[in-house]
Amino acid sequence: ALIGVEHVEVVDQDSSPQPARDVVLWQPEQSLSEDAAALVARLVDQGCQTICFVQSRTVAEVVAVHAQDQVTTGGVVAAYRSGYLPQERRDLEAGLQSGRVNAVIATNALELGVDISGMDAVVIAGYPGRLSAFWQQAGRAGRSGRRSTVVLMARENPLDQYLVQHPELIFSSSVETTVLHPDNPYVMGPHLAAAAQEAFLQPADEAVYGPSLAQVESMLVRQKVLRQRGERLYWTRLDRAVDAIDLRSMGGHGVDVIDSLTGRVVGVVDQAAADRTVHPGAVYLHQGDQWLVDEYRPQEHCALVHRDLPGFWTMPQSASSVRIVREDARHPFGPGYVATGQVELTSQVLGYLRRDEVTNEVWDSIALTMDSHTMTTSGTWWVIPDGVVDELGLDAVKLAGAA
């Protein structure tokens, strides 16, 4: 059903010619971001075309600035993440291909849908959580006939540290089994939008996409991702779907970050991250420039900013809760059971910290009054009998940490 044919032949061996590749496991001596910046600068100075993958947009901007400051040969280091304007992203991609840009600090925006390969080195600052994602990022390294290097830098969390101590798990284990729930609207929605860019959607498409098609189409129309004309739905934007939306999940309408002095759109923040990224008083980083948020207007999908050098950076403080809506399946597991079903996730930004950009010391904590956001999705939970918890001597905090 996935590809429209009944019989397929499995190809599970890679027989393509590949140059030699060294994989290095790295325990940071300083902080992860400091070591990543220093290593990228060293690689650039040695003439290596480099990609460094990091875990968040903010870290990408910070590492890019610090790496550029340490380059001594005139090489160019740039950040690459979602939220850049399409032309900015295309310029960076072209710069990498031509050699005008020597290194990029990227989020997984560069992991998907971008034809960039043949790098001399890939630095992965923090295990991405899945072997498939690790090897996809590592696969960017390797020019024809030239030896390449992949460096995995471990974070301080238990999973990264365990992998560094047991590297055989990286090299001898097969990638994870793909878990697919195509009817999940938060997964199906972005792919329908991308399909609509290629050709309009119509009722007959239910034979391909299944009975959830109409429900997800209605959601996309409400969010103004698609426009309906009669029984057909169209992608109406000039840019590519891969640039405008997250193909992994549906985040809703993006928030434009606008220069309050000129009216120019500086960048775009996806709706799910906007409260944490462009709340009033936030420092918004974009290609090494610092912008201070003057106003955040979620109903108008925009934030007004001005260029500044405030001497601090901001860290949002938020709270979240999960409520089980419906249990669909249950399986015994140890003394308890594991269940799956529908859950409701509620999150709210409560305030933010201002931290010194040099020493990282906390200046102060500022409270915010922000709306809470609720999303219904699929979830998995593990239930342990109270008697077992009491016998182990675990309070609520220790139990959450143990899980």
Role assignments for model-derived ranges:
Residues 147-150, 156-173, 186, 191-203, ...:
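Extended Lys/Arg-rich polyanion-binding regions
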